[in-house]
Amino acid sequence: MRPILIAGNWKMHKTQAEAREFLRELGLALRSSPSGSASQRQIILCVPFTDLAVVAEQSRGSDIAVGAQNLHWEDQGAFTGEISGPMLAELGVRYVIVGHSERRQYFGETDETVNRRLAAAQRHGLTPILCVGESQQQREQGLTESWIVGQLDRALQGIDLENLVIAYEPIWAIGTGQTCAAQEANRVIGLIRQHLGNAQLPILYGGSVKAGNIDELMAQPEIDGVLVGGASLDPQEFARIVNFQALAPA
């Protein structure tokens, strides 16, 4: 059975003091939940570099795993502003987002550099969360499948599928309030899994995930969890997402 992962991506939000307060409030919200379902799900918080040590310390012994939002493919060197796999591993980081659409859009990330970052993460015992997805224009042109397959083929050369998470994040649904229909997300994630030889690795959905749509998303058989953006900044909202109750298929 594939694991269920609920990953929050804080992006460039929260000081250390705010991170401590978030974890305090999240802990209270999860403990007061009547469902008790949180213990059956892996919670991941992918936080800014400055928050990693605080979150790792505060979440020790809990169900929360710490994730980073990027890493360099080299272990050390003259790469101003970057961070390496050994640095993250030393802090207790277990997961790292690679190839997020914002990294591709704003910082020139390519499938080739994504491939190198994936290899670096796995080399140091980190589990990468590879993000793939299509733009609005590609969607309208009917290129969703071919675009995502191309991203996968280029990024996954030489990568171990046994230590990998994939997140399908349609770019047009990120931070826009538009959510990909649950059935459509399930279809695309099924296509990804089929392209990878029905690999049993976790595949998540990301794109305007919130408490109001999590139950329907998690009722889909191919969706193994979610990568949550803005809704992960509110501890009460994030707790409701963690404690989803999957709806019965219509």
From Swiss-Prot:
Annotated keywords:
Cytoplasm, Gluconeogenesis, Glycolysis, Isomerase
Protein's UniProt keywords contain Isomerase:
yes
Q: Which reaction does it catalyse?
A: D-glyceraldehyde 3-phosphate = dihydroxyacetone phosphate
Q: Where in the cell is it found?
A: Cytoplasm
> What EC number(s) has UniProt assigned to this enzyme?
5.3.1.1
Question: Do the record's keywords include Isomerase?
Answer: yes
Q: Which residues does UniProt mark as catalytic?
A: H100, E169
Task: Give the metabolic or biological pathway.
Answer: Carbohydrate biosynthesis; gluconeogenesis; Carbohydrate degradation; glycolysis; D-glyceraldehyde 3-phosphate from glycerone phosphate: step 1/1
User: In terms of domain of life, where is this protein from?
Assistant: Bacteria
PROSITE patterns with a match to the protein in the record:
TIM_1, TIM_2
Report quaternary structure and partners. Homodimer.
Q: Which family does it belong to?
A: Belongs to the triosephosphate isomerase family.
Functional description taken from the UniProt entry: Involved in the gluconeogenesis. Catalyzes stereospecifically the conversion of dihydroxyacetone phosphate (DHAP) to D-glyceraldehyde-3-phosphate (G3P).
Q: What is this protein called?
A: Triosephosphate isomerase
Q: What lineage does UniProt assign to this protein's organism? A: Bacteria, Bacillati, Cyanobacteriota, Cyanophyceae, Synechococcales
